[in-house]
Design a protein with these regions (language model features):
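An amphipathic, aromatic/His-enriched active-site/gating alpha helix that lines ligand/cofactor pockets
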Residues: 16-30, 48-81, 128-135, 154-180
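Short amphipathic alpha-helical/adjacent loop interface patches that line ligand
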Residues: 14, 18, 120, 124
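A mid-sequence, solvent-exposed acidic-amphipathic segment
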Residues: 112, 120-122, 130
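Short, surface-exposed ligand-recognition loops at beta-strand->loop->(often short) alpha-helix junctions
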Residues: 1-10, 107-116
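Short, well-ordered beta-strand segments in beta-rich or mixed alpha/beta enzyme
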Residues: 1, 30-59, 97-107, 136-166
Length: 180
């Protein structure tokens, strides 16, 4: 978590690290920082690397070292969760004050993993294809707890997110997976 009254510092150091890493490190494919809207002391970093070697390279690069030097004053606890990618889809993203980020965590019963995957992934493809306001959709399963799915989504605005929730493909996904 973020130390009390340090959420602005977290946002600053995250922005600096993300810009430098994505712009200058081959193999660092995407990085995003987000804080809970109902608890700004809880933050998440979403990082996507080409492979393990690119991740190791990032850990030894100047942007991460600068982040690591400042982090103890800003962050009082952290937990790393490694995900197995299930779906990675995005458009050209230029965040602004209207852009929203959602992190959704879903537990799927073990016996429904394959069926769930076969329903949710086409829904994500369709969302990116037909919805202008859907900017990115990433899905991964927890390496240690494979029944736990993480979805990181970026929408152009709150309105676009609400429109997404009313599409037939999203409603169909909800209907088909409710029991899973």
């Amino acid at each position: 978590g973020i130390r009390p009254d340090r959420d602005n510092d977290f946002a600053d150091v995250a922005r600096q690290t993300i810009s430098a890493s994505v712009d200058h490190e081959a193999g660092t494919l995407a990085m995003y920082a987000l804080q809970r809207s109902d608890n700004s002391g809880q933050a998440f970093m979403f990082e996507l690397y080409e492979n393990e070697r690119a991740y190791r390279k990032h850990l030894n690069a100047a942007p991460y070292k600068a982040f690591a030097a400042r982090a103890p004053d800003i962050i009082d606890s952290k937990k790393k969760i490694t995900l197995e990618p299930q779906f990675l889809g995005d458009k050209h993203i230029i965040p602004n004050e209207r852009t929203i980020n959602n992190l959704v965590i879903v537990e799927v019963k073990p016996e429904f993993q394959s069926e769930f995957r076969n329903i949710v992934l086409p829904e994500m493809v369709e969302s990116l294809k037909v919805e202008k306001g859907v900017l990115a959709m990433y899905a991964g399963t927890d390496s240690e707890t494979p029944k736990r799915w993480y979805f990181y989504e970026i929408y152009a605005s709150e309105e676009d997110y609400q429109l997404h929730r009313q599409t037939l493909h999203f409603l169909d996904y909800l209907r088909q997976t409710a029991h899973m």
